[in-house]
Design a protein with these regions (language model features):
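Short, basic, low-complexity termini and linkers enriched in Ser/Thr/Gly/Pro
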Residues: 3, 13-17, 95-100, 629-639
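Ser/Thr-rich low-complexity repeats and stalk/linker segments
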Residues: 25, 31-108, 374-376
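Surface beta-strand/loop "capping" patches
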Residues: 30, 39-42, 296-300, 321, ...
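Aromatic-lined ligand-binding clefts that engage carbohydrates, nucleic acids, or primary amines
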Residues: 47, 279, 309-337, 366-368
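Beta-strand-rich ligand-recognition modules
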Residues: 62-85, 97, 333-386
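C-terminal beta-sandwich/jelly-roll accessory domains of carbohydrate-active enzymes
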Residues: 64, 592, 596-670
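An acidic-aromatic loop/edge-strand motif
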Residues: 102-171, 202-288, 363-446
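Catalytic cores of secreted or luminal carbohydrate-active enzymes
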Residues: 245-284, 522-585, 600-602
């Protein structure tokens, strides 16, 4: 009886084992999909998982390669170096008749670029469309492919694969690029124009994230143990889940209470015939309208603003675009009582389409319901505030011709006041190692041609360790890819002055006296690291920023400067990048700077010198085109710096091709 039971058990075990083998699948990472681009000129790793000991065959370009999966089920085949070309088919298959194969079609071989960092990499083609309308309308190149890594985090350790994504090796056209990185799109376009080979653009970024999130634990363990100690709090999954749920519920209840307590909703303050004569008249540039009458501090809650505009018969009924600059931090906007748009966070430009028939001859009313979650509701200066008509109404470069400018005067009434809104999550993406673990590590060893790193805004509050972090990032990523020659182009922070953002009146005020600038400190750290690394270049964009907008629109020019860096690093083109100081000496009453290239001659601004006390003073400077002479009457000058401001609008050292010189600080040699 016992023998019979044992035989039955063995039989069931064998059957289950057979089913397991029959159901087993060979897998490849989600980065491997039809339409992918693989790197020319290097061995091409193809890898994945299978049953331990299973033979996996990879077929590509009329050749077949075999490998046996290890004890952990991992397998890898390195395809030989290939020239650019395609399309090809990549097939991956396990052993056995029942093994399901993987067939990937339309595979190209060309150049693959990884772009990583924070929100300025994220800025989409949709956002910059008004800056480059004609060029974006013409986007169409099936040999440029776009891949967007889905955001994810992991506090415990590295992952083998990424999450599914909606932009997975899509061919470049306006529709596919609309929600894709503008820098990535323009970089692919530029590099294709230079090389005429397929381009693969992998974007792996997350807005607002610090560099520490992109570093592996091993790189932090020795020098920054406090960061890993901080991470340990978030390794408690039960805490993270409970806190996230509590925060989400609190934010949801806050929004519900806000709406229920706002008299403007039930009172229909957006209605065209609503009587606003008793409301207070305010200028959008006078921040007094945003102050609470009870606390005297910026309002948390809602503020309603109404502006009456006159529309003549020629424009009545026509479709238009309402440009409301940028508002902090949320808004719901109405025209003649109809909602025409809303934006639920502070950064996007407000561009709302007005349908045909909504504008009427005579008086029209624009109503804005400001929602301020954290205090400081305001308009951003130096942005367009207008109604635009005509076929060019989508464009800001050049500006549309047929417009009705909005006035700066509004009627204002306080809606409701609230306590500050609780956060909706605990932002695991801002914790050390979490992005390296979840979205960077799984990409290796996918063969790359180069990396673009565009980040730093979130580290500007504490720039001191940034240079070390950046060196560790480049070193650890090169180790991960087993390629110590992997090229990096670091995009330096653009000029930006957050002090001006909080509703200052236009025009922007210039910083003219020497200041301590964390922004410049971080820019200088980026400059210093790039200078010291023979496989890195710096894209200087200190002339492409916007004083009050941390997300400037000129992303095509950013991509072009990144491309110049790669031309020098990879293709050995002797292109000139931004001017660099290669020597300095103290002459009679001046400091003489020798540069690596000629520059535009004339009077120069942005230089400061300091003596023994370390206090900086403005210094006049000029150039004859080959050297810079900085005037110095100081007896014991010790150091010199350039463009040391958040927004150094007057700094004007440029190459003959117009590229700006980087922020720098040097000790003066006597």
């Amino acid at each position: 009886m016992k023998i019979r039971k044992m035989k039955k058990f063995v039989y069931l075990f064998v059957c289950l084992l057979c089913v397991s083998i029959a159901d087993a699948k060979v897998t490849v990472p989600r980065l491997f999909q039809s339409g992918m681009v693989m790197q020319r000129g290097k061995p091409i790793p193809v890898w994945g998982k299978a049953d331990a000991g299973e033979t996996v065959t990879v077929s590509f370009n009329k050749k077949t390669y075999s490998v046996v999966a290890g004890a952990d089920g991992r397998w890898r085949v390195d395809l030989p170096v290939m020239k650019a070309g395609g399309p090809y088919t990549l097939e991956v298959k396990g052993e056995g008749a029942n093994s399901e194969g993987i067939v990937l079609d339309d595979v190209l071989v060309g150049d693959v670029w990884l772009l990583s960092g924070q929100s300025n990499i994220d800025v989409t083609i949709e956002r910059v469309y008004p800056q480059y309308t004609k060029e974006i309308d013409g986007l169409d190149n099936p040999r440029i492919r776009l891949f967007r890594v889905q955001n994810d985090t992991d506090t415990h350790g590295v992952r083998d694969d990424i999450k599914p994504t909606s932009i997975n090796w899509k061919p470049l056209n306006k529709q596919n690029a609309w929600l894709f990185s503008a820098v990535g799109t323009f970089l692919g376009k530029r590099m294709f124009e230079k090389t005429h080979v397929p381009q693969g653009i992998i974007v792996n970024s997350w807005g607002g994230t610090p560099i520490e999130a992109w570093l592996p634990a091993d790189s932090l363990r020795k020098d920054y143990p406090q960061l890993l100690k901080r991470l340990s709090i978030y390794q408690n999954d039960a805490y993270v889940k409970a806190q996230g749920q509590a925060n989400g519920l609190a934010a949801q209840q806050w929004q519900q209470m806000l709406d229920e307590s706002d008299p403007g909703i039930n009172g229909q303050w957006a209605a065209t015939d609503f009587d606003d004569t008793a409301w207070t008249s305010v200028s959008q540039w006078d921040n007094g309208w945003a102050l609470s009458p009870t606390t005297g501090r910026p309002v948390v809650g809602t503020v309603w603003l109404r502006q009456h505009i006159h529309v003549d018969k020629a424009h009545a009924g026509k479709p238009a675009r309402l440009l409301l600059g940028t508002l902090f931090d949320q808004d719901i906007t109405y025209l003649n009582g109809c909602e025409v748009g809303h934006t639920y966070y502070q950064y996007p430009p407000r561009r709302y389409d007005i349908p045909e028939g909504l504008l009427r001859e005579g008086d029209n009313v624009i109503t804005v319901r400001f929602i301020s979650k954290y205090g400081k509701p305001h308009f951003l200066p130096e942005k367009p505030y207008m109604l635009a008509f005509g076929d060019d109404r989508m464009s800001l470069n050049p500006m549309p011709q047929d417009v009705i400018q909005l006035g700066e005067q509004w009627k204002m009434h306080l809606g409701t006041e609230m306590p500050s809104c609780p956060g909706t999550d605990i932002s695991l993406q801002n914790q050390p190692t979490t992005l390296y673990n979840a979205v960077l590590h799984p990409l290796a060893p996918y063969a790359l041609n180069g990396v673009v790193w565009y980040q730093g805004e979130s580290n500007s509050g504490n720039p001191a360790p940034y240079a070390d972090y950046l060196r560790k990032l480049m070193g650890s990523w090169r180790t991960l890819w087993n390629d110590q020659q992997l090229p990096f182009v670091i995009v330096q922070l653009a000029n930006y002055d957050g002090r001006q953002q909080n509703g200052s009146p236009s025009p922007i005020t210039l910083q003219t006296t020497p200041v301590n600038s964390n922004w410049a400190c971080l820019q200088e750290a980026q400059h210093r690291v790039a200078q010291a690394d023979p496989r890195a270049e710096l894209a200087v964009i200190n002339d492409l920023g916007e004083t009050v907008d941390i997300h400037p629109l000129r992303k095509k020019e950013v991509a072009e400067r990144v491309a110049l860096g790669f031309e020098r690093l990879i293709y050995n083109n002797k292109v000139k990048l931004s001017p660099e100081v290669i020597a300095s000496e103290v002459g009679e009453g001046k400091i003489i700077l020798t540069l690596d290239q000629p520059i535009q001659a004339g009077e120069l601004y942005g230089f400061e010198i300091a003596g023994d006390d370390g206090k900086y003073h403005n210094a006049a400077a000029s150039s004859d085109g080959s050297r810079i002479n900085v005037q110095c009457s100081m007896f014991n000058v010790q150091s010199l710096r350039y463009a040391w401001k958040d927004n150094p609008l007057r700094a004007n050292v440029r190459s003959l091709t117009g590229l700006p010189m980087s922020v720098f600080e040097i000790k003066v040699k006597k």
